[in-house]
């Protein structure tokens, strides 16, 4: 069964997991965070954002190191791509998820900004001890982050690498393993160039 993009749902161990944690371009940064904070909770007609919540949002935004703590009342649509991606990551983790699914979450960013967002991602995942699945075509990121690397080709798992083997893996090694396992050459410049 296929769902429209905005309604796509993944089922993992009988959990329904929305495919995205989107922000509204027309809401303020703090309003987007408030909606994410209340996800899965009973909603009331109380004021939307309490002072204590606003201070908690400011503290969490300060930790990102992108100056967003001073942009609580800026509309999300006015933020840079990296700021928006970091905001979305924070929104997705305000309520600790059982599984954080990151699908090409740095693909639309320039290399410098992607590196910053990956550093923020790594810090949040480690500090919050989040089980995370990251989908990427970036070979360097696939090797650098996480405990396990699973590679797909034509819808099938062709590699499953972890432990010491993953720690010692290089992009060249990974390409060679891909060629041997799949019987074809890797053809994505984006994956090679990172």
What are these regions (language model features)?
Residues 92-93:
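ABC ATPase C-loop
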Residues 100-103:
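Catalytic Walker B motif of ABC-type/P-loop ATPase nucleotide-binding domains
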Residues 110:
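ABC-family nucleotide-binding domains
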Residues 114-128:
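Helical segment within the ABC ATPase nucleotide-binding domain
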Residues 136-137:
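H-loop/switch region of ABC-family ATPase nucleotide-binding domains
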Residues 156-182:
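Conserved beta-strand-loop-alpha-helix hinge in the C-terminal portion
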């Amino acid at each position: 069964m296929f769902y429209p993009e905005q309604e796509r749902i993944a089922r993992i161990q009988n959990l329904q997991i929305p495919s995205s944690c989107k922000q509204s371009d027309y809401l303020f940064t703090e309003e987007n965070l408030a909606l994410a904070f209340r996800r899965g909770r009973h909603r009331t007609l109380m004021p939307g954002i309490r002072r204590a919540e606003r201070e908690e949002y400011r503290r969490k935004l300060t930790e990102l190191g992108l100056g967003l703590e001073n942009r609580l009342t800026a509309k999300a649509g006015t933020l840079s791509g990296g700021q928006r991606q970091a905001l979305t990551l924070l929104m997705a983790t305000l309520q600790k998820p059982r599984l954080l699914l990151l699908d090409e979450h740095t693909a639309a960013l320039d290399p410098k900004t992607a590196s910053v967002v990956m550093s923020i991602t790594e810090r949040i995942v480690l500090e919050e001890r989040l089980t995370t699945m990251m989908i990427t075509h970036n070979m360097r990121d696939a090797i650098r982050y996480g405990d396990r690397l699973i590679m797909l080709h034509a819808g099938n798992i062709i590699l499953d690498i972890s432990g010491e083997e993953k720690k010692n893996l290089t992009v060249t090694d990974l390409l060679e393993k891909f060629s041997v396992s799949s019987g074809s050459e890797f053809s994505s410049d984006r994956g090679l160039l990172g």
